[in-house]
Every structure is written in structure tokens, then in C-alpha cells.
Regions:
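Short, well-structured beta-strand
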Residues: 138-207
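Short, exposed beta-strand/loop patches in secreted or surface proteins that constitute
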Residues: 56-58, 131-135, 169
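Conserved polar/disulfide-associated segments of primarily extracytoplasmic proteins
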Residues: 70-153
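Bacterial Sec-dependent N-terminal signal peptides
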Residues: 1-25
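Stable alpha-helical elements in mature extracytoplasmic
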Residues: 49, 99-106, 191-198
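Second-shell loop/turn segments in exported
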Residues: 35, 88-98, 181-189
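Short, solvent-exposed beta-alpha or beta-beta edge segments that form flexible loop/patches at the rim
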Residues: 59-71, 75, 160
Length: 207
């Protein structure tokens, strides 16, 4: 995640982007075949799936993240507010239970690589997640909402992140798009409008 160096020396054959199997993946230079806005002031990070800190998540593809400017500033409503897209190979079937398990594995691994467990052992507790379907939004196959409760490795306190998750496929592409909007703020807060606008503006390709 942001402010932590992830050294990824892996190889990926991406038919859609034309990358050669012998090329190193460079998240900064990666040219996505889809459109996910890059907003001035927002940080971007990309890395390969399977995810180094959550190898039990059984997919292949790319994670593409957008961090709000206030992502690491606890005094703002953008603290821990960000979005990420999973651009996955093939048709991936997802239900609420599968998403819950994926999120538990993801955030458990994330905390581990961003924390010195010997110093915060008394604060560690299992990540919990709760996901349910919500009204399916336009162009989504499915839409979900829910929460993750975990240790905030920045403040060393418990935090609950609210989530909205969108599943989409696109004609002519053997890919599954899974877009996560995340914030500890309640849903009426205007930070959700900014996060959701990324998905509203999303396009399956650049044509």
C-alpha cells in the first residue's frame, strides 16, 4: 500500500495489454487497456495478482488503486478513503461469502506487512468482514456493500471500513472487473461521491 515499498519481480502474460511474458511488471509504467481516472492529487499504485501479502486469494490479474489526497491524514474525512480495481483474468464468480473471505485474507496480510507485530501484539485482533448484496447498479452484474473491522496500522487503533463493491464484465473481453470503494465515513459523506465517480467514469477499453 501507499508509503510502503512493494518490490515485485514477477511475470505476467497479458493478452489484452500485449505485455511479453519475459518483461518485468512495472506498476508505474503499466498502461491499462481500460479507463480508470487518474485524478490530480490522488496517488496511484498498481501491482500483480496473486497478491504478495494475500497469496490465498486465487485470482490472476492486476490491482489498480486510487488513494484520496487525505488517505493518511486522520483529521480529514478522506482518511483511509480509497478505491481499487481488480482486473482479473477469466470469468470469476463472486458472492457475499467469497468476498468476505477475500477481504479477510487481504486485510490480514496488509496489516502484517505494514506492522511490527512484536510492538503491537497487545493490539492485534482478527480481521472481520461482513458483506451483503445491495441493489444492482447500472452496468454491474452484482453490487455489494458491507464492512471490514481491523487494526488500523497507522493509528494502532481499531477501525471499521465501509465498502461498496461492483462486479462487471465487458463484451468481447475474457476479464472480470471488481471495483472496491472504501472509507470509514458513513455513506452519506461526500467522500463517497468522489470514490463512486471513478466507477461512473470507468470504461472497459480506451477506444
Amino acid at each position: 500500500m501507499k508509503n510502503i515499498l512493494f518490490i515485485v519481480v514477477l511475470f505476467l502474460f497479458l493478452k489484452s495489454s500485449g505485455q511479453n511474458v519475459n518483461e518485468e511488471f512495472d506498476g508505474k509504467k503499466c498502461e491499462a487497456p481500460y479507463v480508470l481516472d487518474t485524478i490530480k492529487g490522488w496517488d496511484v499504485e498498481r501491482f500483480l495478482i496473486p497478491i504478495s501479502f494475500a497469496p490465498s486469494i486465487p485470482y490472476k490479474g492486476i490491482e489498480d488503486i486510487r488513494f484520496t489526497p487525505g488517505w493518511a491524514k486522520k483529521t480529514t474525512n478522506e482518511y483511509w478513503s480509497y478505491a481499487f480495481l481488480w482486473y482479473l483474468d477469466g470469468t470469476v464468480t463472486l458472492d457475499a461469502r467469497t468476498i468476505e473471505n477475500n477481504l479477510k485474507a487481504y486485510y490480514t496480510g496488509l496489516i502484517k506487512v505494514n506492522s511490527d507485530s512484536s510492538k503491537i501484539a497487545d493490539k492485534l485482533f482478527p480481521v472481520t468482514s461482513s458483506i451483503k448484496p445491495r441493489t444492482t447498479e447500472k452496468e454491474d452484474l452484482k453490487t455489494f456493500e458491507g464492512s471490514v473491522t481491523m487494526l488500523d496500522y497507522m493509528s494502532k487503533q481499531a477501525i471499521t471500513l465501509n465498502l461498496v463493491i461492483h462486479i462487471r464484465t465487458c463484451a468481447g473481453k475474457d476479464k472480470t472487473f471488481v471495483f472496491h470503494e472504501i472509507s470509514p465515513m458513513p455513506y452519506p459523506d461526500d467522500v463517497w461521491k468522489r470514490l463512486h465517480q471513478l466507477w461512473v467514469n470507468f470504461k472497459c477499453d480506451k477506444k
